[in-house]
């Protein structure tokens, strides 16, 4: 079978048949059809394009009761759950929020004396 005959055979296949062919080739030769990922310079670009942020309570500070109230307001947790979260710092308060939401939460918590990190 020539290369041209193989190409013609592939052209006549359906998408499902092509998918099966790719899987069979991967199994037969121990390779994957995944595209290579560029590693160099990726970390700097990823940091610049970050769209989801985690708000982490680093410490409650001196005004623990006010921090618990703020945590309850932000998260909607009950009193017991909010107290446990504040007592077990550092702890993520909210994950996967926008930069604006994260900055707003950070400002509210720092206003009552908490130490907060946005990651």
Swiss-Prot record:
GO terms for cellular component: cytosolic large ribosomal subunit. SUPFAM superfamilies: ClpS-like, Ribosomal protein L7/12, oligomerisation (N-terminal) domain. One of its GO terms (biological process) is translation. Keywords: Ribonucleoprotein, Ribosomal protein. InterPro entries: Ribosomal_bL12, Ribosomal_bL12_C, Ribosomal_bL12_C/ClpS-like, Ribosomal_bL12_oligo, Ribosomal_bL12_oligo_N_sf. GO terms for molecular function: mRNA binding; structural constituent of ribosome. Belongs to the bacterial ribosomal protein bL12 family. Homodimer. Part of the ribosomal stalk of the 50S ribosomal subunit. Forms a multimeric L10(L12)X complex, where L10 forms an elongated spine to which 2 to 4 L12 dimers bind in a sequential fashion. Binds GTP-bound translation factors. Forms part of the ribosomal stalk which helps the ribosome interact with GTP-bound translation factors. Is thus essential for accurate translation. This is Large ribosomal subunit protein bL12. It comes from Bacillus mycoides (strain KBAB4) (Bacillus weihenstephanensis).
């Amino acid at each position: 079978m020539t290369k041209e005959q193989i190409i013609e055979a592939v052209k006549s296949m359906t998408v499902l048949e092509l998918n099966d062919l790719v899987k069979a080739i991967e199994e037969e030769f121990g390779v994957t059809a995944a595209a290579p990922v560029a590693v160099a310079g990726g970390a700097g670009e990823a940091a610049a394009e970050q769209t989801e942020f985690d708000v982490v309570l680093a410490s409650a500070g001196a005004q623990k009761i006010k921090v618990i109230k703020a945590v309850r307001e932000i998260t909607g947790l009950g009193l017991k759950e909010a107290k446990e979260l504040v007592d077990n710092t550092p702890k993520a308060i909210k994950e996967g929020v926008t930069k604006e939401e994260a900055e707003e939460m950070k400002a509210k918590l720092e206003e009552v004396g908490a130490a907060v990190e946005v990651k």
